[in-house]
Each structure stands twice: as C-alpha cells, then as structure tokens.
C-alpha cells in the first residue's frame, strides 16, 4: 500500500538551513538530485557548504536515493516555501511508512517531523 506523509519543517532550522545554503547552491543540489546524482561531501564543501551540513545533506540524499531505488519511496519533495514536504512511500503498514520517514537524517536532526499520514491509492 502507499502512504502519503506530509511533514512539517521546523521554521528555525529551516531558516538556518536557508542561510547556510544560498539559493544558487540549493538549486545546484536540487538539479543534481533531479538528474539522479547524489553530490558527495567534496562537491558540497566545494560549493561552500560547511562540512557538518554537507555530511547531513549527503546522508539525507543517499537515504532517499536508496529508498527510491528499492521501491520504498515513490515520490517526494518539499513544498514551495519550505513549510511542508510531501513524500509517498510504498510500505506494508502506516507504521512502516512512518519508520521509513523517520529514518531520514533530516528527520533525525529535527529539521522536519510528520504532520499527517494518509493511506493512498494511486489511480493515475
């Protein structure tokens, strides 16, 4: 079954993240991700990202890539304005979907938490 999880970003951590990631850096990371490439630590620090934040981002993007490649993550990403994110998980139960979400390093570091969960049937 598929589950839609709507996550709520922590506004203070998001503000810090946006300060540490200029728009052009975020755009480059986003584009690489859309192209199927996970940037490594050297590439991120080369863009001026602190080594601590770069490691969290590498772990986050690697986690999502592994989930996607294994079929556990159907789709996902932040909503405009970084107040929420929407992820669609393939899971045997709601709890398993929650566990997949909470295993994300950004969730572990408190950048976001689950706001709502819905069982979902994909029709189109």
Please provide the spans of the model-predicted regions.
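Conserved, structured core segments of small domains
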Residues: 1-124
